[in-house]
């Protein structure tokens, strides 16, 4: 096997990278000190810098995959290796080049997430000891690493553990941090003024600003309150500081601009959280106002302007400070000097629209540039509306009307005035908004519907080429933004017009048309979709053809997948068409398989990929309802593509393919499993496949489906034992134990007792061991459901007798102790209606089985506890209300922006997978229980009624009689 540096060098060559990566994976599996070898390569002076960089990147990814691996994982970093890494990595980082410092600093921050401070108590002292009064490059590395560790506090919820960690840091870090802060401040006043030294100094100041925010983000520490004047005075000086030596390249956001933007974040935090002690608030308001009214429109200032406006917005939203701005003249100046200049189109905006339209869309819709001038200006207007709604609405409306008037005089030349008017109208009209729901509340002083009829609809109905594409894009955006305010007929009438814009040559226009298509199809009035499958049927084929034409016109897999909005529109059409999609089935299969084959070559856009597989899932969902013939058509088209993904080991796609395979297997009814699926069973049992966390949910579902459809295949090929081996691995994991129960449910319902007999004792031994030694609340609840499920079912190895005998095989008589001490007390905690139904039926089966109810039965002492538990399930409130999600609503809300695409599993909403009620025929549980108890009572010669009369309190007896039980 080649050595590691040779393999790393080969990863840099596209023709050899895949084989080199496979060989490195072998090293990972075989060499427990693999991580140390990578670090040694990074440390070796004679190694080529590109190989050292490759080693640092591979090391970073290796640590992220395996640092927190569970016991039993195929790759796990030993405690000894972990300690060596922590001992060496800081010194190695400090002596490395900048680009490698970044990678190692990220690793330190990642390890700190798990080990700091409890298992890495030397980290902070080591970092502090490296701080220098003169070496700014070392300080940059140290402070960058500290920021990587502390910044994770920012989004966290308050907790005792979090505050203990922060206190640990504050007690050790504050004094040296202040000393360095004072030193850099003095150096700035008295030190050298050459560009290189100044730049390094301000890089340190920038990191000091970021760390100041980190250390103050949860609460204001006493130390910083005591030294607030020192810090804030320095920040104020930095905010007004200028020096031509720091200008850098034209158009570049230099470090001084970044420092000022970071200070804006700090003063916004203090305004929002610690305003009562922030005595210099108005000093910062004044310098910020001056800044905003003097900065040029250059792009390099965009981030600073955005954060400066965010700070002013935070001040304005506090009523007592808003009064500072309440004079009409001040409000007028806000709109004219701050808002309007930052909403108006710049030449750079037009260039972005033409030259990088995808980035334009992302900035406009996703907030990828959340500090953009226009976005921040709009938020500022809405902040002013909170307190001065009438005045601001009046002032802005005047500017809207003036811009519309200018546009009307010469639409082809003054089109940018219409653009500004639309931006301003949205700014004052919207009071509440979410990406998923659109506008949820509006300013009642403006008429959204009238504005649509007078200013939007006429543009949309103009012939192609009349309205400028940037205005047309805003017109379309208006429709999907205010989709909940426009009435059903307006949306239905404009829908065909929106679809026509898919044929426009402008990337932004056809993308916004695709977004409108997607979002309009989910609109509900009175909880009912306004666009039914019948209503959209005439538009299905033309829209799909045009969308596929655009997607497939790309020259590379990366370009093909870049516009996820188009694929989301395809997905939405398939979902909403339901069975009406059947005439387009062949077309869809042809295009979806072709696209999957292409993007498999180089998966580059996780969101596009997710919508692609959701589209396939939606197609399977709709077509499988048409019978076995269409399922066969689906299998013939899709299985070869899925096979290719698995053979080529396209890691990103495997969880998706496994879900879709599960859906296909489940849809095939009682048809024999296709050979391809049969041949998949053994690979699915390979332990290596289960090491990837993202595969586990889909693998469990696929195994469940294959066991249900082909139990004899598992029996004849001796696959039952490997399946139980997987169950054992899952059940030992606190993260994945619930998947182990999902698999065990299916094993018990499908395989007969004679098949499972050799394993029953060990299965229950594993469960009881977890309950005794390492139980969690989730495990206990899931184990409770499993016990009741086994008791309630009558197939396979289920049934109350099998449950009791299986548990007692571990230790005689332990079933009764388990029920009274753990299982029965947990039943009332079950929240989902289906779990409670299964539990009630399981309790009923146990109550009426011979091992409990028969004279001199071993567990007759459980009769009253079991019966009491049934009554509590029926009559007492649920401790924590919870319901199964509405699957249709879930599909309406499919949004890849909210999903994670790394090791985690991304569920496909369209593949179903919803739990099925195993007892759909039982609708009135109380009556059913009474009937079964009456039958058992007769069979036992009235024994049950005798025990109830003697031992169950009178109110319990009355409740039972109300169900129909005869005592």
Curated annotation (Swiss-Prot):
Which is one GO molecular function term here? small GTPase binding
Question: Which Pfam families does the UniProt entry name for this protein?
Answer: CAS_CSE1, Cse1, IBN_N
Mainly localized where? cytoplasm
InterPro entries xref list: ARM-like (IPR011989), ARM-type_fold (IPR016024), Importin-beta_N (IPR001494), XPO2_C (IPR005043), XPO2_central (IPR013713)
* Domain Importin N-terminal, residue spans: 20-95
Q: Which domain of life is it from?
A: Eukaryota
What GO biological process term is on the record, naming one?
Answer: protein export from nucleus
Tell whether Nucleus is among the UniProt keywords: yes
* Coiled-coil annotated spans: none
Keyword annotations for this protein, in alphabetical order, are: Cytoplasm, Nucleus, Protein transport, Transport
Q: Which GO terms describe its cellular component?
A: cytosol; nuclear envelope; nuclear periphery
Would the keyword Nucleus turn up in this protein's UniProt record? Answer: yes
Q: Where in the cell is it found?
A: Cytoplasm; Nucleus envelope
| UniProt function note | Export receptor for importin alpha. Mediates importin-alpha re-export from the nucleus to the cytoplasm after import substrates have been released into the nucleoplasm.
Oligomeric form and interacting partners: Binds with high affinity to importin-alpha only in the presence of RanGTP.
Q: Which family does it belong to?
A: Belongs to the XPO2/CSE1 family.
Spell out the protein name for this chain. Answer: Importin-alpha re-exporter
């Amino acid at each position: 096997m080649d050595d590691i540096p040779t393999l790393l060098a080969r990863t840099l060559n596209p023709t050899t990278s895949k084989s080199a990566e496979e060989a490195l994976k072998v090293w990972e599996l075989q060499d427990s000190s693999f991580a140390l070898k990578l670090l040694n390569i990074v440390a070796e002076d004679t190694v080529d810098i590109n190989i050292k960089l490759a080693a640092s990147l591979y090391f970073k990814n290796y640590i992220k995959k395996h640092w927190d691996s569970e016991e039993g994982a195929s790759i796990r970093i030993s405690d000894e290796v972990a300690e060596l890494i922590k001992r060496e990595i800081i010194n190695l980082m400090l002596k490395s080049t900048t680009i490698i410092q970044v990678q190692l600093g990220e690793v330190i921050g990642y390890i700190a997430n798990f080990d700091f401070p409890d298992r890495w108590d030397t980290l902070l002292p080591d970092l502090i000891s490296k701080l220098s009064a003169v070496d700014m490059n070392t300080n940059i590395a140290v402070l960058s690493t500290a920021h990587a560790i502390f910044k994770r506090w920012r989004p966290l919820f308050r907790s005792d553990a979090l505050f203990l960690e922060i206190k640990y840091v504050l007690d050790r870090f504050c004094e040296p941090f202040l000393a360095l802060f004072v030193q850099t401040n003095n150096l700035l006043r008295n030190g050298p003024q050459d560009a290189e030294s100044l730049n390094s100094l301000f890089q340190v100041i920038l990191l000091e600003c970021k760390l100041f925010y980190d250390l103050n983000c949860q609460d204001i520490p006493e130390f910083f309150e005591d030294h607030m004047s020192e810090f804030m005075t320095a920040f104020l000086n930095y905010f007004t500081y200028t020096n031509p030596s720091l200008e850098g390249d034209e158009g570049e956001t230099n470090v001084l601009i970044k420092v000022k933007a970071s200070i804006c974040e700090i003063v916004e935090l203090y305004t929002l959280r610690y305003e009562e002690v922030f005595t210099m608030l108005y000093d910062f308001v004044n310098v910020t106002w001056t800044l905003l009214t003097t900065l040029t429109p250059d792009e390099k200032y965009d981030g600073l302007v955005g954060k400066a406006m965010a700070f002013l917005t935070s001040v304005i939203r506090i009523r007592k400070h808003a009064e500072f701005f309440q004079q009409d003249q001040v409000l007028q100046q806000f709109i004219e000097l701050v808002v309007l200049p930052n909403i108006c189109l710049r030449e750079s905006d037009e260039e972005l629209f033409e030259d990088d339209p995808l980035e334009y869309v992302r900035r406009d819709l996703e907030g990828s540039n959340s500090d953009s001038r226009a976005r921040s200006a709009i938020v500022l207007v809405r902040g002013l509306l909170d307190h001065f709604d009438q005045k601001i609405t009046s002032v802005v409306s005047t500017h809207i009307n003036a811009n519309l008037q200018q546009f009307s005089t010469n639409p082809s030349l003054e089109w940018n005035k219409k653009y500004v008017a639309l931006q301003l109208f949205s700014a004052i009209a919207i009071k509440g908004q979410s990406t998923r729901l659109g506008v949820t509340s509006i300013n009642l002083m403006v008429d959204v519907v009238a504005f649509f009829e007078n200013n939007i609809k006429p543009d949309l109905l103009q012939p192609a080429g009349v309205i400028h594409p940037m205005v047309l894009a805003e017109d379309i955006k208006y429709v999907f933004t205010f989709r909940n305010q426009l009435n059903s007929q307006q949306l239905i009438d404009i829908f065909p017009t929106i679809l026509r814009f898919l044929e426009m040559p402008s990337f932004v226009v056809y993308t916004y048309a695709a977004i409108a298509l997607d979002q309009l199809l989910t609109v509900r009035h009175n909880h009912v979709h306004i666009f039914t499958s019948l209503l959209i049927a005439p538009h299905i084929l033309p829209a799909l053809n045009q969308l596929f034409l655009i997607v497939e016109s790309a020259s590379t897999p990366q370009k093909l997948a870049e516009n996820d909005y188009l694929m989301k529109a395809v997905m939405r059409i398939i979902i909403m068409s339901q069975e009406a999609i059947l005439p387009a089935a062949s077309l869809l299969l042809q295009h979806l398989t072709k696209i999957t084959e292409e993007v498999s070559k180089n998966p580059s856009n996780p969101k596009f990929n997710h919508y692609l597989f959701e589209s396939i899932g939606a197609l399977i969902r709709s077509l499988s309802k048409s019978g076995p013939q269409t399922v066969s058509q689906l299998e013939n088209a899709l299985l070869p593509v899925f096979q290719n993904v698995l053979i080529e080991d396209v890691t990103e796609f495997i969880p998706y393919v496994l879900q879709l395979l599960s859906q296909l297997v489940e849809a095939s009814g009682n048809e024999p499993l296709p050979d391809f699926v049969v041949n998949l069973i053994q690979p699915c049992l390979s332990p290596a496949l289960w090491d990837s966390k993202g595969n586990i949910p889909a693998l469990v579902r696929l195994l469940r489906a294959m066991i249900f459809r082909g139990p004899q295949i598992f029996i004849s090929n001796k696959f039952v034992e490997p399946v139980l081996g997987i169950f054992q691995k899952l059940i030992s994991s606190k993260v994945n134990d619930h998947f182990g129960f999902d698999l065990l449910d299916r094993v018990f319902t499908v395989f007969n007792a004679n098949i499972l007999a050799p394993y029953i004792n060990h299965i229950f031994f594993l469960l009881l061991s977890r309950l005794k030694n390492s139980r969690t609340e989730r495990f206990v609840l899931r184990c409770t459901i499993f016990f009741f499920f086994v008791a309630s079912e009558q197939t396979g190895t289920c049934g109350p007798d099998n449950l009791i005998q299986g548990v007692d095989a571990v230790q005689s008589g332990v079933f009764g102790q388990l029920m009274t001490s753990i299982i029965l007390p947990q039943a009332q905690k079950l929240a989902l209606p289906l779990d409670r139904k299964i539990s009630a039926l399981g309790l009923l089966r146990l109550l009426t089985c011979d091992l409990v109810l028969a004279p001199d039965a071993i567990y007759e002492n459980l009769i009253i506890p079991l019966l009491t538990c049934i009554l509590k399930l029926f009559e007492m409130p649920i401790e924590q209300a919870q319901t199964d999600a509405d699957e249709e609503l879930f599909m309406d809300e499919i949004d890849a922006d909210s999903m994670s695409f790394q090791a985690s599993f991304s569920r496909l909403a369209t593949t179903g997978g919803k739990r099925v009620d195993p007892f759909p025929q039982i609708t009135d549980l109380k009556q059913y229980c009474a009937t079964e108890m009456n039958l058992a009572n007769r069979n036992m010669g009235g024994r049950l009624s005798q025990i109830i009369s003697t031992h169950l309190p009178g109110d319990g007896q009355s409740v039972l009689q109300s169900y129909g039980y005869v005592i």
